[in-house]
Amino acid sequence: MTALLIDGNALSKTLRTQAAQRAAALTARGHQPGLAVVLVGANPASEVYVRNKIKACEDNGFFSHKDAYPDTLSEADLLARIDELNRDPKIHGILVQLPLPAHIDSHKVLEAIAPEKDVDGFHVANAGALMTGKPLFRPCTPYGVMKMFEAHDIPLQGANAVVIGRSNIVGKPMAMMLLEAGATVTICHSKTRDLAAHTRQADIVVAAVGKRNILTADMVKPGATVIDVGMNRDDAGKLCGDVDFAGVKEVAGHITPVPGGVGPMTITMLLINTIEAAERAAAAA
């Protein structure tokens, strides 16, 4: 049995078309959705991510604004700029690209973003509201994974789900969303004693640790759904995930590739969150 591929590019295309239609409707009413992206320093990976986010905005009828600062920018100046963006009615979403330079407290910066413009879903108000199932925004990567489950009719209610990774960006919110959908959730991490004992029981495995081959074929229950959130490089410098794709695809029922799986969905859900912020602002105007 070879697993069915969950194609993030195809699903992204569909969702971006819907986002573009919603953006056009808002723009016609004088409320073009606007996203501000703030980049501090010259991290090459961050520059690529920011470029992709700006392009996605431009391609789908969103207004986008990019602030690029040297890594010498002070924390106070960054906080002052966020305050300006919070008060700018043309901006509905604010995204500060992580990581930030060491002298800037990223927690303080993320908390400075107005919760109603926190399209990454990282503000403590949104992270906390996720516990009650009522956040203004859900973090983009796990939100995108949930859309993948939905698009492929993968049953979550009563399913045993294992999330490998406990980051605030993916692991924890992913576990909360699966729990909300009725799954029985286990979170595994670097201190987990016998990872395979957990994953072999799982109907769904989400790997999100940034470590190559953390999940191999012998660790997967036949027919399970495997979601690979990892972004790594193999020995040849080629992009790969956390999952041994070649082996696991022969055992799993569904699997996401890297690249072309979860990655495109993250930016797509950023657009969806931004359009929702703009629609709320327009309704309140």
From Swiss-Prot:
It catalyses: (6R)-5,10-methylene-5,6,7,8-tetrahydrofolate + NADP(+) = (6R)-5,10-methenyltetrahydrofolate + NADPH; (6R)-5,10-methenyltetrahydrofolate + H2O = (6R)-10-formyltetrahydrofolate + H(+). Gene3D superfamilies: Leucine Dehydrogenase, chain A, domain 1, NAD(P)-binding Rossmann-like Domain. One of its GO terms (cellular component) is cytosol. PROSITE patterns: THF_DHG_CYH_1, THF_DHG_CYH_2. InterPro entries: Aminoacid_DH-like_N_sf (IPR046346), NAD(P)-bd_dom_sf (IPR036291), THF_DH/CycHdrlase (IPR000672), THF_DH/CycHdrlase_cat_dom (IPR020630), THF_DH/CycHdrlase_CS (IPR020867), THF_DH/CycHdrlase_NAD-bd_dom (IPR020631). One of its GO terms (biological process) is purine nucleotide biosynthetic process. One of its GO terms (molecular function) is methenyltetrahydrofolate cyclohydrolase activity. NADP(+) binds at G165, R166, S167, S190. It holds the Pfam family THF_DHG_CYH. It comes from the Bacteria. Homodimer. Belongs to the tetrahydrofolate dehydrogenase/cyclohydrolase family. PANTHER family: C-1-TETRAHYDROFOLATE SYNTHASE, CYTOPLASMIC (PTHR48099:SF5), C-1-TETRAHYDROFOLATE SYNTHASE, CYTOPLASMIC-RELATED (PTHR48099). This is Bifunctional protein FolD. It comes from Burkholderia ambifaria (strain ATCC BAA-244 / DSM 16087 / CCUG 44356 / LMG 19182 / AMMD) (Burkholderia cepacia (strain AMMD)). The gene is folD.
